[in-house]
UniProtKB/Swiss-Prot annotation:
Organism: Mus musculus (Mouse)
A GO cellular component entry from the record: nucleus
Quaternary data: Interacts (via KBM motif) with XRCC5/Ku80 and XRCC6/Ku70 heterodimer. Interacts (via XLF motif) with TRIM28/KAP1, ATM, MRE11, NBN and RAD50. Interacts with splicing factor SF3B1. Interacts with ERCC6L2; this interaction is DNA independent.
InterPro entries: MRI
Alphabetic keyword roster: Acetylation, Chromosome, Cytoplasm, DNA damage, DNA repair, Nucleus
Entry-annotated residues carrying N-acetylmethionine: 1
Name listed for the protein in its UniProt record: Cell cycle regulator of non-homologous end joining
GO terms under biological process: DNA damage response; double-strand break repair via nonhomologous end joining; immunoglobulin V(D)J recombination; negative regulation of double-strand break repair via nonhomologous end joining; positive regulation of double-strand break repair via nonhomologous end joining; protein homooligomerization; protein localization to site of double-strand break
A Pfam family assignment: MRI
Amino acid sequence: METLKSKTKTRVLPSWMTAPVDERKVVSVKTATRKQTAAWAQRVGAATRAPATETVYCMNEAEMVDVALGILIEGRKQEKPWEQRSLEATDKLQLSPPCSSSPGSSSEEEDSRISSLAPGLSPPRGPEASDSPCSRSPEEEKEEEDALKYVREIFFS
């Protein structure tokens, strides 16, 4: 065993591992990236301005939906106002059934309103059933329209 310890085994290393390290060749990562971006800026011709910085964000589903709704709202605001009004007017006409002139509606009118609902939707029941769609306050209609507006934008545009 002592004979094994006394002998020192020499390893043959490749030349790139045994070459002396030159101080100028060792460059930090930050300096290398700065040089690369500077070279890129010179090639593009924008050496006078700083390179653009890109930021990447990770979002969960709720944040992504919020951002998407914000983008839709901004896009909607940038559209022509008359076009938006005409779209809202046609949507409102399609969604709201006609109001009856008499306070008591006949059963035929009620049946026609119920049959005009989409399949799978039932008429409102309970205390809300006695209220006609025309007796809603403008605030309630506006809230409902806002909620449906986003759904229409997402699924039908």
